Amino acid sequence: GLLLLGTMLSSWVGTTGASMLMVRPMIKMNAWRKRRSHIMVFFIFLISNMGGCLTPIGDPPLLMGFMRGVPFFWSLHLLPILIFNTVVLLTVFYFLDRRAYRKDIAEGRKPDISKPGTEVHILGLHNLIFLAMIVAAVILSGTLPGMVAFQDVNGAVKGIPVFEDVKLTYPALIEVVIILAAAFLSFKTTKPEIRRKNHFTWGAIKEVAVLFVGIFITMQPALMILKAKGAELGITEPFQMFWATGLLSSFLDNTPTYLVFLTTAGSLGFTEGMQTILGTVPVAMLEAISCGAVFMGANTYI
């Protein structure tokens, strides 16, 4: 039940948010069991990755696509694929878990619901307001650049010059300000006791921040090369895009991998399909890249 609920939440609160929300109850509910390692494997596949495929908020690769012209709700095209894969994985999980559960019971293990902390409590519901602010900020980041008020006479998005040709666009600045404001208000208005009980630390956030800064800086030359030479790779079919994106997403971060192959697809010269900043991408190919990045990103922790 928790796996299905978390999978449904992932596209609307993000895979990271859904994982943080569901992991503590999942661990506590199964703490009495000896055979439980398989639970986190399915947790990672379903909640931490696959469940986020329906919106750009769900998984970072789709956010990169949204920022490059893919419509916000286009990812809902992946719903049938998500349903099929979720049913398959939950069916496999059911039989594996039932077998492990019966072995634990046979050895005399059983849950002790008398211990403190075994009841489910939902605290901090006011944070839904700040979550809505973040969702709005993401949507604005993709819609504001198309408005005349944010464009100069040449049609380019206005912004603040940072370094040579690099500039911080006003839509991006608005997005950052709203998200930081939501985070600040959440931190200040939520009782510290709630974070303490959830064992909240800044460690994971710092690690992800450092990792992403490094990845996105070093990937720029590769993206420029692919934009110019992508058509020469010989990857022209959706199934090729799916496996190439998926395999690399398993060992690299799936966000830059998605961006690399979206750039490649946009450079192939297609005339029919989804219009993006990077070029026209056939719908089937965009679906293949999206599924490869989101679904196979679960194969390793990276």
Predicted segment positions?
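Transmembrane helix-loop junctions at the membrane interface of multipass transporters and ion channels
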Residues: L54, D59-S75, A137-A149
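Juxtamembrane and boundary regions of transmembrane helices in multi-pass small-molecule transporters
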Residues: R35, L54-T55, F73-E119, F295-I302
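C-terminal ends of transmembrane helices
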Residues: G1, I27-N30, F93-R99, S186-F200
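Long, contiguous bundles of hydrophobic transmembrane helices that form the permeation core
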Residues: L89-A156
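Small-residue-rich segments of transmembrane alpha-helices in multi-pass membrane proteins
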Residues: L2-M8, I44-C53, K110-G117, A204-I217, ...
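Generic alpha-helical transmembrane segments of integral inner-membrane proteins
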Residues: L4, M8, I83-T91, F95, ...
